[in-house]
């Protein structure tokens, strides 16, 4: 009985961790003649916090936060150090529907269908490459199935 409880607890905790990892930043979709979403922010580092910790907390990629904070030690920025959060993005010049992967920016954009009220949003996630020097396949694709 205890073993079953521990297994369920493990999956519950693991599920919560995965949910946190996959959270995106959501922005209202601007009109078609506007390509910029978000805004640059500045926060102050807490004690023992790394740039990687800050990037994870704010849905940013490692390269994004390091390039926005040149001259700051990525592993020990120091308590109270101002950290620039590059949370302003230029939407890719593609149709604003479905999933768009901007490889150069290392960012994924998801344009879901409009809500029942007609509101449109865009979700954005940092992404990473699988392995250095491997080519990423280019083209239009379609998700035909999903397993959970």
Regions from the PLM with identified roles:
Residues 26-59:
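Primarily a LysM-type cell-wall glycan-binding module
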Residues 63-72, 81-97, 123-130:
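N-terminal post-signal-peptidase region of extra-cytosolic proteins
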Residues 92-148:
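Gly/Pro-biased beta-strand-loop elements
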